[in-house]
Regions:
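Short, structured active-site "lid" loops
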Residues: 57-73, 218-242, 246
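ATP-dependent NMP and nucleoside kinases share a basic, alpha-helical "lid"
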Residues: 102-108, 127-131, 253-278
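The conserved Walker
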Residues: 181
Length: 278
C-alpha cells in the first residue's frame, strides 16, 4: 500500500503514548482536524520495559498499528510513530526528540505553511516554543470525556466503553474451556455465554465436517490446515469486532486442534506436511 502524505497547508500535530487510545484522544484529534486541513498523529514511546505502554503489554509497534487502525478510513489523518529508544530523559532529550518530530513532519507532509501542536501540559508549550519556534502550540483543555489511559489500564472492564475498538482486543478476557471430547464443553460454554451476556466461539470442526460431510477418520492434512486457520480466524473475529463487554468464551482453540493433529496424524504424514501445521 502506498504511503499517504498530507497535502494540506495547515497541519495539526497530536502526539502521545496512547496506551491505550481512548475516545478522549479521538475527540481531541477530531477537534484538531476541524481547525486544520490535516492532522499528523504521532505515537511515541519505545519497545523497552522503560515504556509504560510496553510494560502493560502494548509495545510501541502494536500501539502504532492499532492507532492506524482507528483512522484507517480517515483521509485527513496520518499516523506515524516516534521510537524514543536512545533519546535521553527530559530535559536533555528535548532537542533530539524535537528533531525526530521535524523529520516525521517532513516525511508525512508537503511543505505546510502552518504547523500547530495540540498539547495538554504547560511544560510542552514552553519547550516546544523554545525548540520549535516556527510552529504554534495550543494548550488544550481536557476533553469533556473524563477518562485517562491510566484509569483504563488500572480497570479496563469498568472503563470499557471508553476504549477504542482496536485496543479492546488487548484488554479482552478470553476464557477457554478444555476437556475430553463429548464431555459437555460446548454446553458449558453456551451456558456461560448466556449467563454473562458474552459471545462464544465454538468448535469449528463440527461446522466444517457437517458442511463437507466428512467423518473424523477421513480428515487429512488439508482438512486440518483449514481447521487450524479457520478456528483461529473465527475466535479472532469475535474478539476484534469489539462488540462485547470485554469477555468471550471458547470451547476450543487452534492450540487444542494442534494437539489432536499431533495425536492422530503425526505418524501418518510426512515431516514436511507436519511442519506446515506448525
Amino acid at each position: 500500500m502506498k504511503r499517504k502524505q498530507l497535502s494540506g497547508k495547515h497541519i495539526g500535530i497530536v502526539f502521545g503514548t496512547f496506551a491505550p487510545m481512548h475516545v478522549g484522544h479521538v475527540d481531541l484529534i477530531t477537534k484538531a482536524k476541524r481547525a486544520n486541513d490535516n492532522v499528523l498523529v504521532i505515537v511515541s514511546g519505545s519497545n523497552t520495559q522503560e515504556d509504560r505502554g510496553t510494560r502493560a503489554g502494548l509495545s510501541l509497534n502494536r500501539r502504532f498499528r492499532y492507532v492506524r487502525e482507528v483512522f484507517y478510513d480517515d483521509e485527513l489523518v496520518v499516523v506515524d510513530k516516534l521510537d524514543e529508544a536512545g533519546i535521553p530523559a527530559y530535559p536533555e532529550g528535548w532537542v533530539p526528540w524535537v528533531n525526530h518530530v521535524k523529520e516525521l513532519i517532513s516525511k508525512n507532509t508537503d511543505n505546510p505553511e502552518k504547523i500547530t501542536f495540540y498539547v495538554g501540559e504547560p511544560e510542552y508549550v514552553t519547550e516546544l516554543n523554545r525548540y520549535y519556534p516556527q510552529a504554534q502550540v495550543e494548550l488544550i483543555e481536557r476533553s469533556i470525556i473524563n477518562i485517562s489511559a491510566t484509569e483504563i489500564r488500572d480497570n479496563p472492564m469498568e472503563n470499557w466503553s471508553f476504549i477504542t475498538k482496536p485496543f479492546r482486543r488487548h484488554f479482552t478476557h478470553k476464557v477457554l474451556v478444555v476437556g475430553s471430547a463429548s464431555g459437555g464443553k460446548t454446553t458449558l460454554v453456551k451456558d456461560l455465554a448466556r449467563t454473562y451476556n458474552a459471545p462464544c466461539s465454538l468448535e469449528y470442526a463440527r461446522e466444517y465436517q457437517e458442511k463437507y460431510n466428512v467423518r473424523d477418520d477421513e480428515l487429512d492434512t488439508n482438512d486440518y490446515i483449514h481447521l487450524l486457520t479457520d478456528q483461529y480466524a473465527q475466535t479472532s473475529d469475535i474478539i476484534d469486532k469489539g462488540q462485547h463487554s470485554g469477555l468471550i468464551f471458547a470451547d476450543t482453540n487452534s492450540t487444542v486442534t494442534k494437539v489432536y493433529i499431533d495425536y492422530y496424524l503425526k505418524e501418518n504424514i510426512s515431516q514436511e506436511e507436519f511442519d506446515m501445521l506448525d
